[in-house]
């Protein structure tokens, strides 16, 4: 009837079987097409770049993104799940440069832009088969047959439409600014790209002496972390509100901030002290004479950004290489001296270092200044410096003509929209993301590269500019535009427009746009909106759920918000789970260099998807760093998946023996207390998991399921095994079967979004195998409805207390080194009495004859109370020895009871009144001789550990039963097989066996016990006594 559980199959084998089933029955497709009349639930899949291999970080994003849409489908929502691929930009171009053995823009242009772009286009799906394979094995259900692709014309056209909207709102402009610039890639970068590439570097700084003009031996001492910018110096900045001094140091007069005199070496004498304002206008001699400025230069100016945190309180100013410097240069009309070319190398005018990359020139510049006496000193300084997020080259702040989106004009709206987003964790709103938004600068979107969405702006030599927002507009305004125009360079560059002002041809500006603009446009561009799918867009915008790694606070999350705010005046997403980084098993960042990278395919092929998924759901909150290794995933598999699988296997094994069909008992209601309890727990679970998932509490929901499975296996099934072993199909046995069946079926649905493979296998075996009209897959089922009338909170609380008491009893046994199979006489419990039913359970579980509730444990326990030094020591450090003495002089039991009850106890030590409580005292309790104690919170138990002869005999009996049952299992006997038992070699134990012979036969299905030797017998240690035992199947 049920599908037999094949013990030879691993979980990975089972997952392969499930994948085959999904393919054969087109389950994924049916899931996508389900709930067509339902309310939309919108989810956006952030596009990865498919020209690189997937890594373990992509597993966590996929398992988190997969769960919520699965749950919403089961709740009846219509959930479009469109996959996407990010195909433009530097990541692709750099790979092609490596492939072709070329480097940099000159070599690309020598190779040929058209050929280079074709190579880029052909490469973007190099690893798509690996991505699809990983996603399929992981059970990540998104539509990969009809993905959005950022290089497709339809997608680009939608991006052009967005840029046109910005153009019409005067948000798009061209400016000459200092921008973060990658000399290796030859292009400017945006602030959010820069934010992803900061690294702590240790570099040489320079304390430089600028000779005061007209003074023989007087210098202004300035400090810089970028010596390469010194040849372009045109001014020095001070803060006019600070105090400055002139000192004599090593025979030279030096000027610097008073607060930073400690930077000086050797002794010094302060000659005068004055406000910075006195220095304004002071002139000094040009440090390097590689260029002749065309404006007034080389004098002291005021800068608000000058601080006293480092250096000398005097900053050298080179307007060509820094935003603050550039703004100050504009304020004072300073000359801009740029001595660095687009490759980040010094131009020919800088004779000593021409053609040298500026960062490599730093030590040579320092040596040069040391030789000519302008270097006061140089020190190593660790600071955070931006590097290219893709090629790792140190960035330069460099003057460039670039196109910008006027994000500063939208700052208030960005902040307002950010505050409406539900971030998980919440501190992202005001912290990492919020701070970035509050300090937003204009977005430099143009890139001087080749493979990307072309900036759709055409310019005329008369100065007129126009932005094109669609292919139709391009054909209307363009001259001989090809019918099937390819919207990439170099083809689009050949299209000319006629200038409406002067009639001359207009040429497209050469740049492509930031590839992050592509991905941030996906809410509408994936649908080719507004040219198609207007209704679908309106139903799915904004997204109700997105999730990616924390890095995307500077990437996709920002561009989504920036673009949607500028066009639609609101955020494009409502709820976002921000995922933490995946670390190795030691908590270290994974890297090829360290050799600690875990291949996702190794884990999927060895431990399987469900184990992988469950590990990420339960190991920590999604936004915290997660340790990940094959060992960790294997442990997750053993503790949770194996436990659930064993419960399912247990049911199938016995239900098959009894040919039990739950369809014959659809209306059966069990009156058994344990059945009522597990049904109550199941309905509470269904309710709580649904509530957690509705509020994106993935980890809380998963842990609830984990706790339930633990209760189901280690309490319900274990406590009820004997009900399945009875020969007749009594009402009690039917109740046990019906209850476990219903629990497993409902649990398969509740856990389906989390562990889609195992739940499918359980559902297929328990449901589709016996119900022809059932849904084909658990993933096509509706989320189970909980029944409030079946939830008994009192019953759950009572059982929870009973379980806690049992756990404490086991702990006390372990502490006394007494096995659970050894019966004990009595256990005393501090809590109020439970109904008799639970007393029976506790006695049976802990193998004790008697349980006393509401007991006074003080008679059996020794109390020891000590000061909690980290707490008391802070306030009363010197008094601790006397506090300890005072505590030890008090009645320990009474003090412990008062403290445990929450009372504050006051003592006087050397005239100081000190209040003792549960926070500043450590109370430990240990059982007196003959007793074992364990406690937690308000629950305490004491076991009487004295073992009488009668109890010892019962202990022997339990051990013999355990050994025989294990021998049955190891011999491969079926559950219903009858056996014969041979025992010999120990007269004492043989007498015990004779005494309990009927019990042993009943428990082990033995037809006979033979007291004679058998050559094949195994020797067992039975509580210190040796016994020869052999079992054989009774034919």
UniProtKB/Swiss-Prot annotation:
Query: From the record, which residues define motif 'KMSKS' region?
Result: 589-593
State its Enzyme Commission number(s): 6.1.1.5
Keyword Repressor appears in the UniProt entry: no
Keyword ATP-binding attributed: yes
Q: Which compartments is it annotated to reside in?
A: Cytoplasm
| Catalyses which reaction(s) | tRNA(Ile) + L-isoleucine + ATP = L-isoleucyl-tRNA(Ile) + AMP + diphosphate
Gene Ontology terms: biological process = isoleucyl-tRNA aminoacylation
This protein's GO cellular component annotations are: cytoplasm
The principal localisation class reads cytoplasm
The EC category is: ligase
Q: Which cofactor does it need?
A: Zn(2+)
The molecular function terms of the Gene Ontology recorded here are:
aminoacyl-tRNA deacylase activity; ATP binding; isoleucine-tRNA ligase activity; tRNA binding; zinc ion binding
Q: Which superkingdom, per the lineage?
A: Bacteria
Q: Which Pfam families match?
A: Anticodon_1 (PF08264), DUF5915 (PF19302), tRNA-synt_1 (PF00133)
Q: Where is this motif: 'HIGH' region?
A: 48-58
State which residue ranges cross the membrane: none
Q: Which family does the record claim for this protein?
A: Belongs to the class-I aminoacyl-tRNA synthetase family. IleS type 2 subfamily.
- Physiological role: Catalyzes the attachment of isoleucine to tRNA(Ile). As IleRS can inadvertently accommodate and process structurally similar amino acids such as valine, to avoid such errors it has two additional distinct tRNA(Ile)-dependent editing activities. One activity is designated as 'pretransfer' editing and involves the hydrolysis of activated Val-AMP. The other activity is designated 'posttransfer' editing and involves deacylation of mischarged Val-tRNA(Ile).
This protein's assembly is summarised as: Monomer.
Domain text: IleRS has two distinct active sites: one for aminoacylation and one for editing. The misactivated valine is translocated from the active site to the editing site, which sterically excludes the correctly activated isoleucine. The single editing site contains two valyl binding pockets, one specific for each substrate (Val-AMP or Val-tRNA(Ile)).
The name of this protein is: Isoleucine--tRNA ligase
According to its UniProt entry, this protein's organism is: Clostridium acetobutylicum (strain ATCC 824 / DSM 792 / JCM 1419 / IAM 19013 / LMG 5710 / NBRC 13948 / NRRL B-527 / VKM B-1787 / 2291 / W)
């Amino acid at each position: 009837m049920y599908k037999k559980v094949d013990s030879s199959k691993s979980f990975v084998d089972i997952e392969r079987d499930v994948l085959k089933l999904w393919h054969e029955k087109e389950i994924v497709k049916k899931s996508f097409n389900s709930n067509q009349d339902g309310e939309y639930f919108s989810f956006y899949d952030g596009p990865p770049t498919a020209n690189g291999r997937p890594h373990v970080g992509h597993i966590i994003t996929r398992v988190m993104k997969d769960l919520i849409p699965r749950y919403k489908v089961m709740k009846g929502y219509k959930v479009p799940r469109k996959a996407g691929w990010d195909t433009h930009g530097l990541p692709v171009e750099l790979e092609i440069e490596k492939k072709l053995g070329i480097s940099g823009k000159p070599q690309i242009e020598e190779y040929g832009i058209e050929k280079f772009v074709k190579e880029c286009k052909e490469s973007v799906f190099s690893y798509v088969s690996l991505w699809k394979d990983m996603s399929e094995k992981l059970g990540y259900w998104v539509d990969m047959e009809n993905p959005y692709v950022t290089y497709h014309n339809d997608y680009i056209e939608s991006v052009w439409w967005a840029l046109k909207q910005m153009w019409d709102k005067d948000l798009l402009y061209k400016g000459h600014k200092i921008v973060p610039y990658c000399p290796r890639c030859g292009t400017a970068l945006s602030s959010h790209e820069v934010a992803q590439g900061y690294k702590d570097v240790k570099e040489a700084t320079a304390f430089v002496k600028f000779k005061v003009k007209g003074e023989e031996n007087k210098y202004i001492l300035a400090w810089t972390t970028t010596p390469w910018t010194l040849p372009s110096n045109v001014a020095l900045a001070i803060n006019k509100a600070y105090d400055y001094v002139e000192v004599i140091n090593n025979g030279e007069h030096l000027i610097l901030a008073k607060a930073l005199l400690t930077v000086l070496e050797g002794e010094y004498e302060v000659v005068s002290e004055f406000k910075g304002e006195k220095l304004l206008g002071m002139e000094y001699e040009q440090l390097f004479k590689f260029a002749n400025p065309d404006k007034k230069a080389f004098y002291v100016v005021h800068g608000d950004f000058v601080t006293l945190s480092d250096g000398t309180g005097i900053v050298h100013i080179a307007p060509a290489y820094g935003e603050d410097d550039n703004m100050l240069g504009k304020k004072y009309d300073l000359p801009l001296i740029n001595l660095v070319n687009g490759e980040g190398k010094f131009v020919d005018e800088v004779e000593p270092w021409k053609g040298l990359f500026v960062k490599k020139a730093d030590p040579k510049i320092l040596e040069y200044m040391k030789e000519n006496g302008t270097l006061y000193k140089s020190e190593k300084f660790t600071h955070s410096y931006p590097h290219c997020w893709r090629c790792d080259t140190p960035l330069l702040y460099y003057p460039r003509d670039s196109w910008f989106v006027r994000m500063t004009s939208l700052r208030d709206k960005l902040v307002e929209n950010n505050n409406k987003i539900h971030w998980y964790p919440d501190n992202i709103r005001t912290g990492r993301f919020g701070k970035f938004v509050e300090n937003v600068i204009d977005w430099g979107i143009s890139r001087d590269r080749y493979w990307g969405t072309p900036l759709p702006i055409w310019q005329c030599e008369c100065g007129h500019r126009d932005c094109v927002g669609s292919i139709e507009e391009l054909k209307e305004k363009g001259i001989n535009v090809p019918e099937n125009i390819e919207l990439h360079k170099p083809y689009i560059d050949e299209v000319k427009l006629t200038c409406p002002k002067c009639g001359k041809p207009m040429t497209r500006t050469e740049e492509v746009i930031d590839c992050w603009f592509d991905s941030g446009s996906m809410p509408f561009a994936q649908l080719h909106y507004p040219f198609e799918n207007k209704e679908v867009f309106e139903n799915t915008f904004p997204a109700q759920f997105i999730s990616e790694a924390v890095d995307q606070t500077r990437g996709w999350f920002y561009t989504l918000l920036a673009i949607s705010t500028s066009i639609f005046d609101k955020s494009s997403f409502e709820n976002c789970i921000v995922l933490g980084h995946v670390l190795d098993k030691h908590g270290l960042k994974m890297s090829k260099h360290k050799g600690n990278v875990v291949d996702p395919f190794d884990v999927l092929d060895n431990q399987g998807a469900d184990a992988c998924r469950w590990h990420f759901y339960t190991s920590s909150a999604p936004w915290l760093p997660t340790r990940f290794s094959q060992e960790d995933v294997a442990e997750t598999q053993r503790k949770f998946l194996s436990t659930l699988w064993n419960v399912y296997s247990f049911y199938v094994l016995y239900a098959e023996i009894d040919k039990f069909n739950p369809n014959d008992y659809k209306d059966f209601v069990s009156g058994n207390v344990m059945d009522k309890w597990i049904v109550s727990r199941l309905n509470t679970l269904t309710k709580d998991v649904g509530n957690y998932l509705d509020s994106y509490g993935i980890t809380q929901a998963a842990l609830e399921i984990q706790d339930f499975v633990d209760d189901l296996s280690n309490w319900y099934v274990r406590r009820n095994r004997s009900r399945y072993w009875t020969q007749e199909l009594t009402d009690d046995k039917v109740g046990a079967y019906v209850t476990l069946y219903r629990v497993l079926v409902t649990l398969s649905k509740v856990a389906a979004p989390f562990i889609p493979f195992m739940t499918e296998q359980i559902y297929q075996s328990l449901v589709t195998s016996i119900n022809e009209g059932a849904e084909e897959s658990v993933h096509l089922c509706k989320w189970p409805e909980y029944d409030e009338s079946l939830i008994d909170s009192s019953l759950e609380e009572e059982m929870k207390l009973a379980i806690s008491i049992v756990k404490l009893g086991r702990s006390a046994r372990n502490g006394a080194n007494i096995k659970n199979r050894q019966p004990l006489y009595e256990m005393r419990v501090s809590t109020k009495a439970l109904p008799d039913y639970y007393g029976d359970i506790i006695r049976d579980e802990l193998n004790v004859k008697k349980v006393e509730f509401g007991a006074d444990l003080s008679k059996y326990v020794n109390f020891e109370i000590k000061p909690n030094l980290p707490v008391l020591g802070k306030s009363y450090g010197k008094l601790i020895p006397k506090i300890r003495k005072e505590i030890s002089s008090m009645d320990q039991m009474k003090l412990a009871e008062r403290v445990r009850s929450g009372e504050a106890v006051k003592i006087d030590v050397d005239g100081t009144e000190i209040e003792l409580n549960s926070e500043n005292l450590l109370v430990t309790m240990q059982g007196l001789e003959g007793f074992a104690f364990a406690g937690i919170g308000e629950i305490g138990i004491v076991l009487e550990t004295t073992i009488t002869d009668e109890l010892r005999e019962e202990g022997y009996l339990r051990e013999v039963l355990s050994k025989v049952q294990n021998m049955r299992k190891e011999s491969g006997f079926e559950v219903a097989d009858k056996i014969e038992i041979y025992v010999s070699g120990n007269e004492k134990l043989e007498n015990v066996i004779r005494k309990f012979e009927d019990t042993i036969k009943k428990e082990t299905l033995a037809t006979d016990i033979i007291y004679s030797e058998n050559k094949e017998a195994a020797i067992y240690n039975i509580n210190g006594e040796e016994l020869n035992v052999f079992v054989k199947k009774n034919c």
